[in-house]
Amino acid sequence: MKIEAVIFDWAGTTVDYGCFAPLEVFMKIFHKRGVEITVEEARKPMGLLKIDHVRALTEMPRIADEWKRVFGQLPTEVDIHEMYEEFEEILFSILPSYATPIEGVKEVIASLRERGIKIGSTTGYTREMMDIVAKEAALQGYKPDFLVTPDDVPAGRPYPWMCYKNAMELDVYPMNHMIKVGDTVSDMKEGRNAGMWTVGVILGSSELGLTEEEVESMDSVELREKIEVVRNRFVENGAHFTIETMQELENIIEHIEKQELIIS
């Protein structure tokens, strides 16, 4: 068994530590309409195509009830599209500031390439959003061999189509010769649905939802508890392995290759 390619998520995995770029924008577009949503609610659908993320928020029972209290009816598709248009406009203006590679990512990518491993990527961002993020990340030294957005396939996560398109472009088959690395539940489902080894990264993830400063200053016992909650969430949603930082990824690769493991 040889791992031939690794498919990475972007925000919260390789760039934008903590995946903060979309968070406040989601909260802002609901606040503007008199509907308050929490940070936890805003994060829950992270990893989905962003219009699907807005739709998922409106379908949460508490948010739907609050919307009905304010407007006298449940959110409509018109409401969802109006909010998404506002979301896009605000997000485009701030994305360049949220494309910095997470510490250690560039070094890990370089090491993987030395092993002959190809680097692909998937995302919940649209192609237009990723044109901004990928360009800025490349200027800072991170550029995967291939990028697929939900715009390029029939549907985004949790469907496996973005992973399949990476496999075709990178010329890697069967799918168990590839690893999917991400920081959200939808990443785990995407990888498993594609028949790939699936790895959840915890520190810097949307699921953990902490800044670097918060991680560094937090009581070690409290931080460990939060890490274990995220680890369990990843495993419950299909992760074969979890890592706290990207630097642990090569150990996972060596384990898979040496043990001749089979995806179950």
Swiss-Prot record:
GO-annotated cellular components: cytosol
Cofactor note as given: Binds 1 Mg(2+) ion per subunit.
Binding site for Mg(2+): 9, 11, 183
EC number: 3.11.1.1
GO biological process, alphabetically ordered: DNA repair; organic phosphonate catabolic process
Active site per database record: 9 (nucleophile), 50 (schiff-base intermediate with substrate)
Keyword Metal-binding: yes
Domain of life per record: Bacteria
Top EC class, one word: hydrolase
Keywords assigned: Hydrolase, Magnesium, Metal-binding, Schiff base
One of the Pfam families matching this protein, by short name: HAD_2
UniProt GO MF annotations: magnesium ion binding; phosphoglycolate phosphatase activity; phosphonoacetaldehyde hydrolase activity
CDD domains, sorted: HAD_PHN
Cofactor: Mg(2+)
Described purpose of this protein according to its UniProt entry: Involved in phosphonate degradation.
Similarity annotation: Belongs to the HAD-like hydrolase superfamily. PhnX family.
Subunit: Homodimer.
Protein name: Phosphonoacetaldehyde hydrolase
